[in-house]
Amino acid sequence: MKILLLCTAHNSLSQRLYLTLTLKHEVTVEYALSTDTMIEAASLAHPHLIICPFLTSTVPTEVYTKYMTLIVHPGAPGDGGPSALDFMLMGEDGTDEDIERVITKDLWSEHGRSHWGVTVLQAIEKFDAGPVWAWEQFKVNIDDHTITKSSLYRGDVTRAALIACSTAIERIELAARQTKATKTGEAVDWECISPGLETKPEYRTASASTGEPFLGGHTCPLPLLKAANRGFDVHRHGARMISRLIRASDSQPGCLTRNFSPNLYVYGGLIEDCEHMSTIEVKPGTFIGVRNDAVCFKTLDGKGIWITHGRRVKRKTDPTLWPKVPAIPLFVDLGIVDLKKLPQFLPLLPEDFAKLDYPTFQELYVEYDEIATGQRVAYLTFDFYNGAMSTNQCRQMCAALRSILETHTDSNPLSAVVLLGGTYFSNGIHLNVIESSPDPAHESWANINAINDVILFVLHDFAVRGITTVAALRGNAAAGGVALAAAADLVLAGEHVVMNPAYRALGLFGSEYHTITYHGRVGHDAGHHLLRDMLPVSAHQAKDIGLVDVVLPGYGESLDTAIHKHVSELVSTNQKPGRWKHNLDLSPLALATTRMQELGEMAKDFWSARSIRYHSRRSDFVRKVKATKTPLRFARHRRKVGELDEEESDSFDLIETFAMLVRKTQEQAMQQTIEQLKMQARRASTPATVEEKDKRQLEMLFSCYYGS
């Protein structure tokens, strides 16, 4: 079947769906940049089926009336609107359909819904109201303070979406067979798939996997949840509600708070409930502690809330969004806190990185496990926001790894160390911190060297002591995060993990010793394709080529159990993984040479004329600048013979290519300046007319910078 994915962005859900569908179908992707773009894409692809896994705009009538078009909605049947997950995580439970009253009077549910779902429905004129082809549900606990909208989306929502989409496709195939009375075993005539196919009533009432009705309560269409309705009041809301509001707004747009001056979007929402909280006698909203660039404030019910990140509010005069950065640097810059005067009522983290046994903010900790044979294993959990690892966070990780090494003695040896990421394993360097730096190139250099130091521990320091290293991917990984995993002796990955090894799409050569680890693991040719194709890779695909060693079933607690079981068996049977290293020179000299060569290329990416490719792409990514077109590597329906994306060409690596671009840009800027000076010279005689022409010209040239 030919399937077209229409999406606002090729995100974690659409990538997972793409990888699943391509096993059986011919799939192509188009960014929904405009109505005309979507109509043109459908015309070029001429698909049998269109699926919209992540779409924030309306499907054009010309598309859904001609092609069977499915919308993946992150809500249960009957729910509708763009803020489904947000409302659910805040405590909307369907008992009161007057959502404005719920918001204004804080009539949120005490415990929230027990279940939520994902619905695959057919696109029609009315938003999220078409015939249901399939839906799936999952359990949810909205007061688990570690769950955010984005982590729920990457986890349970994505898994449910895959089940619902697969079921919907099967049902559409069945309906197509029935329209032409195709015999069992005969190939389906895909041309029979049309918007006129009819669903069955039970598709709306019974879940795809179990056939059960929706167990999460009554649902109804809900409006867009505006930023003004997401804020918290420290004099009215307790820790649980504030946590809900912040976590429900995670990723986009953030929780807009007016409790600090100036107003800003905040992220995090983790609850602090240490035994000392009852002794801290300060007003609600008062800052009571700092930890790893996060800040905690007191709540009216005697607990605390951690703000880990913040973002300035975009003004009408701001060309783009501001970066999302760690809270403390932002708060200091805005004058919200003075570190010299900020009290520290909360206990410090343990020096040995032990896990705390009460609700708090702790993004990195170590647990030691002694298996039945008496051998010791260290589990290092690191759960950095959005998987990004800043310079400071990399240094913290190095300190934790050093602490683990110090426990390894002749009398009490350590057999293995396991790197456990969080809902993301790692996405490499912290682009938002880099973008917000006064000198992004310098911060990029510091960050890449810091993450290289982390990987050197994995490749060398543990290896020379005979300690097995294991990377256990419970969540997605990208760029330097994939290289971090690849450096381990053994890579375990959950079956739902998606990996994006390439750096080029961001305009980087990449470091993290990837030129030696990828070569050792997958070979030269496969490694070249990993980096140049710039396509997502599933856990099973990664295993097929050697990037992953073992794919484990399950997720959540079941995956954790599988990881511990596999590591215990590995250690107890004295297995020595890491065969990929056997023919490699991993001596200190070879590693230093590799690092120097990679950093030589990265220096070009940070400071030479070629740096344009990285600095511009990083800025667009961080500030959420809308793409101008879909990359041809995704939009197969647009690619002509021999046609390449800019990042796919060899010239993308040449400094000369970008030096010419710099000269051309400078010439255009000079010409623009000359034209503006000419306008100013004429302004005295015809001021009104010239001002209007000048205004229109600026809007045309800089329209992308002056959106509200």
For each of these PLM feature ranges, what is it?
Residues 1-9, 192, 201-220, 225-362, ...:
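An anion-binding loop in the catalytic cleft
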Residues 548-613:
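C-terminal long alpha-helix characteristic of the crotonase
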Residues 25-37:
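A short beta-strand-loop structural module common to alpha/beta enzyme folds
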Residues 461-467, 472-476, 487-498, 502-577:
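Crotonase-fold acyl-CoA enzyme core
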Residues 320, 324-418:
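Conserved CoA-thioester-binding segment of acyl-CoA-metabolizing enzymes
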Residues 661-708:
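Fungal intrinsically disordered, low-complexity serine/threonine- and proline-rich regulatory regions
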Residues 2-4, 55-218:
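Donor/substrate-binding cores of folate-linked one-carbon enzymes
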